[in-house]
Amino acid sequence: MRPGFSWNFNGGALWALPFIAAAITLTTVAQTGAVTDKDVRPILEKNCFQCHGENLKMANLDLRSRELILKGGNTGPALVPGHAAESLIYKRVTGQQTPKMPLAPVPALTESEVAILKNWIDQGAKWDAGAPAVTSVSGDKANASYSEYKERVITDEMRHWWAFQKPSRLNPPAVTPARWSTNPIDMFIKATMDAKGLTPAPQADRATLIRRAYLDLTGLLPSPAEVDAFVSDSSPRAYEDMIERLLASSHYGERWGRFWLDVVRFAESSGYEHDRTLNTAWRYRDYVIKSLNDDKPYNRFVIEQLAGDEMDKPTDDSLIATAFYRVGPRVRFREKDNPYYRYDYMDDILRTTFGGFMGLSVQCARCHDHKFDPITRMDYYRSMGMFFGYVNYDHLLVPKKEADEWAATTREVLRQIAPLKKEIAQIEAPYKRKQFEETVKKLPEDVQLAIKTPVDERTSGQKLLAAQFESGLDVDPDANADDDLAKIVLAATDDNFYHYTPPSEAKQGYQRRGLKLSDADEQKRKELQDHIAELQKKIPKVPTAVEGVRDGDYRLAPDGPGDIPLPGKSRAEYGVKCCYLPDPGQEYKVPDVHFGANGLNLEEDMKGPVVQPGFLQVLVNGTPPPVAVPPKRTDYVSSGRRRALAEWIASPDNPLTARVMVNRIWYWHFGTGIVATPGNFGKMGTLPSHPELLDWLATEFIRQGWSIKQIHRMIMNSETYKMASGFYNAGNVGKDPTDVYLWRYPVRRLEGEAIRDIILSASDKINFQAGGPSFFPAIPLSVRVGYANGRWDLTKEEPATWRRSVYSYWKRGMKFPMFDVHDQPDQNMTAERRNISTVPTQALMLLNDEFVLQQSRLLAERVAHEAGSDLPAEVKLLYKIAISRQPTEKELRDDLEFVNHEQSIQAAQAGDSGSVGKAVEDIRLRAMSRLAHVMLNSNEFVYIN
């Protein structure tokens, strides 16, 4: 070792050595090309064995040895030694063939790992004959396949977990002093403090209480006048009356609606590579806000979202609520042609439903029995059966008569247009055929051969090559079926391209060109197009609609651009006998759910036994509830399964639903829940800090008609909520350093959305326009680089974009920077809680963001206007607006000195630049803007104290 150089192997460095070594190894192997099975096996073990190993062999594929890889699974050998480009395993991990592997949530292979795998295959895929098959990831051996699976018996002992028992209601314990003995919440909290030897903090001052309440319930600042009025009001009900005013405010739903939108993974774009805009998602957001403002009973709130269309008397609200299913992440490709997406969507819905409403993680049971909670793999598929009938459906929010008239008129116009479009297609057909043939001639020979080979005679490699070119092409029904080239024509309409643009087309660079027609044909086509345009004007405006769901059969969705038939068998042979959307009087059967099905191979899926719908066994003790509650309506066909599930979840007998919701409300008030893991009440979650209080609140929630606002009243009127946050007691800190038992009010930082809102509230420039389509916050063009997919309207900072943050557009592929740096959650899954980080980018955002600088100046203008020309009065008003209190003498003195110093600097700069006419008022405004900027960056401003 060189003199003067030493290694410091402390704990903070040793942990990284394995990762550094692994990175060096991967890079070296990838570069040198000397690859053996010792390099490949760890990659397979980490990324593949969970689904293709000892305990689980999805698609009958086992990757634990060379022989097994060569044997392959349902789609044939996974490996062609010496030819990575022809090997299915390589195509899948690189995304050349869908679905790309490994499936989420397992991360994609790194570039180095892909390079190692490719080199290994190209070198012949050598494998040490003496090397043992790598042990698979942990799991129950019984879960290897449906033929070997034996469902775990749920015992009474498993049901004894506290969260699976119905809440018991104990009388609140007697405590002293008297002010702690009037609210049951205080009685439980104080009894625990007494038992732990903790001393409660005194009550916070009134200025702190009003600011805390306003930020908590509305996410807005109280005005200086409201602060003064409350502080000077000595009436006994002053505080209670303030809470009632806030609960009655429309801004309450805007604040608390954002929390619920986290739970249901709400966003307004589909995510993934296309990230399409969900045009009516904002209606669901408005439904949530309205429901909270109306104090809709929580049990009805649950039922409407899961089965609003299946209610006996559905309303616009209940139909809008079914967008719960549609606001999650979705790919662009259709489920009927890509069944594995159907199962991914089912997993998303199961995860969101059980995690959001019941605090359970069921997704682990997709591949094996839950490792910690008594939830079996069969439970998972039973639960899937309760949802499996749903299909996407746009509900018209108009009277039925009006909807029927619109549909009839539209159908008639489209009937008249159809022959005109067919005539255009006949005119274009020979030109398209010629263009297609010319395009094919320019392709590589292997692609030409693949396209010309009849579909049923293509090899797996030819299918891949042909698909990369043919995706998005339509089949001409009038063409000669014996001529493979003639029966494939390029899609003619721009709207087809809009709805379906295959990624393979962009990747391979195959481009469609405009057709060059003869003058006569061009004239004829134009006449037909003009006729179509005139007819289209007769189509009435589409009535107001919302993207929701109803029951149907996803396998029979109408054909569209890019659709392909099910492989091997007809839909009828697969048991599909009904239709996409059943009409009144028509027999309807929910598609069967087969145990272990994943949509990757339909024939293999159907070998699994049909699973009957049902509920989680651990929560059903005795006679189970009915699995179907069809709507009592003659004009609507539905299975009633989703309604049965919704009513079971929303039942007072369900031990989890009420507990989970009151715990969420508690968490959103205090920054931590009575159960610190609000999305996991299972054995991997934390135990409740105050179990008797949690059960009392859950039973009271039900007794009060599932009223969320009533729980707010109880919490906010408690002494527990009104305690000071700055209280210090050495004994308390020693016994309970993290304030688990709430001996003082827990300080917490506001979310990014609330910070933006209170900045606008401080400057008095907030736009209170409520509801309707979302606005696009101004984002620098530099941030938008690389996010070309989907929509983000370019805007500037102006009143139209100064609406409350809950109404801003939420795009999965591009987060708004201010929200993102302040821990905006992942919108692809239910967010049980928000992470709270403290990182430099947060301070840098508030210091340098154009929006914050602009609002700082507007705040300074407000202060100057309302306080007059008295500088001390301006500083005092600034404090009152921003943090609801007067400055201390020292703060006032320091701030006046700061402003005067800034004015001197501004005046000197004006003199140096020759700006003699620079107004004194402008210099002072600039100086006050600096102080306002400091205030907006202070902890006291962005925290609830």
Name what the model sees in each region.
Residues 1-11:
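N-terminal secretory signal peptides that target proteins for export/translocation
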Residues 15-27:
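Bacterial N-terminal signal peptides
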Residues 28-118, 126-190, 207-212, 222-230, ...:
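Solvent-exposed helix-loop boundary motif
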Residues 61-68, 130, 136-171, 279-281, ...:
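Primarily the internal scaffold of c-type cytochrome electron-transfer domains
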Residues 119-124, 778:
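Short, well-ordered beta-strand segments
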Residues 176-251, 265-313, 374, 418-424, ...:
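Primarily short, surface-exposed interaction patches in extracytoplasmic proteins
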Residues 931:
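Globin-like tetrapyrrole-binding proteins
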